[in-house]
Amino acid sequence: CRRLALEGYLAIAPELYFREGDPNDFADIPTLLSGLVAKVPDSQVLADLDHVASWASRNGGDVHRLMITGFCWGGRITWLYAAHNPQLKAAVAWYGKLTGDKSLNSPKQPVDIATDLNAPVLGLYGGQDNSIPQESVETMRQALRAANAKAEIIVYPDAGHAFNADYRPSYHAESAKDGWQRMLEWFKQYGGKRN
């Protein structure tokens, strides 16, 4: 958020699973994902993001330049939100899950909504990501192509999952830097110029 704010954006990082508990209470990421994040219904998250957009529009944000980005779980949500909100102008999903099992809380995966995108989406993925197989990335590419969707997926061959997380061993500086530049260009191209 800070880095986007320094670029001139009104950037907000909402706590989208606060109703389910405190993420700080979980010892590691796998436990956090299964014990907290998986309990949050997609419909609740999308509604909360609508409320964030509404709040931003009343507090200095330009609803005509609404954009979203997210990482990992947030990357998956980014794809879903691009199909949910018709006001969205641009989206960038960083290594978000594309395919998988459906549940009551997650009735659709990004591959299921490729035909419904309201905004151009840039997907940034690691070729060495063990949690998102390249087969699922290719399945998403095919779905986007078939839908004639305005979307692009970039795969960084030497990067794994969470390659932009500079506080984790998975950080891959070259891919992270390139991905960040691509995100800024995507936002500029589709979301409009900064103030």
What are these model-derived regions, one by one?
Residues C1-N195:
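N-terminal cap/leader regions of alpha/beta-hydrolase-fold enzymes
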